Amino acid sequence: MVTLLPIEGQEIHFFEILESECVLYTGWIERASGSSIYPEAKARLPLEALLGSNKEPMLPKETVLSLKRYNLGSSAMKRNVPGHVLQRPSYLTRIQVTLLCNSSAEAL
């Protein structure tokens, strides 16, 4: 079963978010996985804290991490995720790989 994420009153499949949204991982890691074995993820921010009135993710000024956005939906569904994304030695990559591994193979 694929994790469902509640967004604006409706539940959306995790792989649909990968396919259609370009979201900062820190915004939805807590809802997608519930917890993480990686210590860096403990500093995650809830999605509501990142969203402004225009629903655009807003990071606090004191955030030092260089956060990147990825849209892996089509690539993941074709089993053709770019190597530089999966091999990038950062906690965002580890979260990404963890989330993809936690999703059911049928959904991807």
UniProtKB/Swiss-Prot annotation:
Gene Ontology cellular-component terms listed: cytosol; mitochondrion
Tissue: Ubiquitously expressed.
UniProt entry keywords in alphabetical sequence: Apoptosis, Cytoplasm, Mitochondrion
Subcellular location(s) of the protein: Cytoplasm; Mitochondrion
Record has Mitochondrion as a keyword: yes
Chain positions of motif BH3-like: 5-12
Principal location: cytoplasm
GO process annotations (BP): apoptotic process; positive regulation of apoptotic process
Physiological role: Functions as a proapoptotic molecule through the caspase-dependent mitochondrial pathway of cell death.
Stated name of the protein: BH3-like motif-containing cell death inducer
